[in-house]
A protein has these predicted regions:
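Short, conserved structural patches
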Residues: 53-141
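Alpha-helical assembly-interface signal, strongest on the long, hydrophobic N-terminal helix that forms
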Residues: 1-65
């Protein structure tokens, strides 16, 4: 009978390097994507509502900036676009602040593609929009 020696050590090392490490990186990358995607939607809804109540997009900008800071994001990692303006170009659209008007905001949040313990690699902008109507019977004075 021949002496058969196994290759379990080599197979284990290859399995960890080829299968486990990429799977772990994929799982770790899902958390920030999910968190920041939810942040974009919530920031869009809250900032649009704040702008409608205060009749000012500046108030909406402040609400979104505060939410960004609460999540520990750099201010450059979130951008807003009001009433059709592109967030990437400054986002200062003109929103009509009259009864029955619709105020729309688009929020973009930077999401890293891969998150490792040593830092983030790559990234994409996740975008969410929300529209809020100004009440027809509200006092504007």
């Amino acid at each position: 009978m021949k002496d058969e020696r196994g290759h379990a050590g080599i197979e284990l090392a290859l399995a960890v390097a080829v299968l486990m490490i990429p799977a772990a990186i994929a799982v770790l990358g899902f958390g920030p994507w999910s968190e920041r995607s939810v942040l974009a939607g919530a920031a869009a809804a809250e900032s649009a509502r704040a702008a409608v109540i205060a009749l000012s997009t500046t108030t909406g900008d402040q609400v979104a900036a505060e939410m960004s800071l609460n999540y520990g994001l750099d201010p450059t990692e979130m951008r807003l676009g009001w009433c059709g303006a592109e967030p990437a170009t400054g986002g200062a659209g003109t929103c009509p602040m009259s009864r029955g008007a619709t105020v729309e905001v688009t929020v973009e949040v930077w999401v890293p593609v891969i998150t490792t313990p040593w830092g983030e690699i790559g990234g994409v902008w996740v975008s969410r929009s929300h529209a809020e109507s100004i009440d027809l019977y509200r006092s504007l004075g």
